[in-house]
Amino acid sequence: MAPKGSERTVKKVVAENRKARFNYEIVDTYEAGLVLTGTEVKSLREGKANIAESYATDEGGEIWLINSYLPEYLQANRFNHETRRRRKLLLSRREVNRLQGAVNREGMSLIPLRIYFNERGRAKLELALGKGKKLHDKRETSKERDWNRQKNRLLKERG
């Protein structure tokens, strides 16, 4: 058995919300399981999913993923799933309470960052707790990114 520090985690990313880090200031991230049907898992394994317009919300003491798009599995015929149905997220009670408190008291948002398969083959969602950025914050982020690109170009040219 290998020592604990030498474990490698292999994550196959299926869908990523690339705009989330631009539109939100990420405070904390959580790993949540997804309650999926068989055809949804097969569709995910094909790498077809979109979480760009999705969000998570708290309803009745549970966290739900809303508006995520998992296309129909072509070989499933009449037993297919709804493409944009609400999907329950599996989190521990302590994590749910922490997220509810942050959303209700501090006005934060629950943003899905990416869906991936962990080393055991389970579909997981990386969920972020974040605050929405104002327009001037977004401009500042893009200016900083442009400056870093220019700086790297200059350093590369000078050798």
Swiss-Prot record:
Residues 133-159 are annotated as: Disordered. PROSITE patterns: SSRP. Its main location: cytoplasm. One of its GO terms (molecular function) is RNA binding. This is SsrA-binding protein. Residues 137-159 have a biased composition (Basic and acidic residues). The keyword Metal-binding does not apply. Required for rescue of stalled ribosomes mediated by trans-translation. Binds to transfer-messenger RNA (tmRNA), required for stable association of tmRNA with ribosomes. tmRNA and SmpB together mimic tRNA shape, replacing the anticodon stem-loop with SmpB. tmRNA is encoded by the ssrA gene; the 2 termini fold to resemble tRNA(Ala) and it encodes a 'tag peptide', a short internal open reading frame. During trans-translation Ala-aminoacylated tmRNA acts like a tRNA, entering the A-site of stalled ribosomes, displacing the stalled mRNA. Belongs to the SmpB family. CDD domains: SmpB (cd09294). It comes from the Bacteria. Keywords: Cytoplasm, RNA-binding.
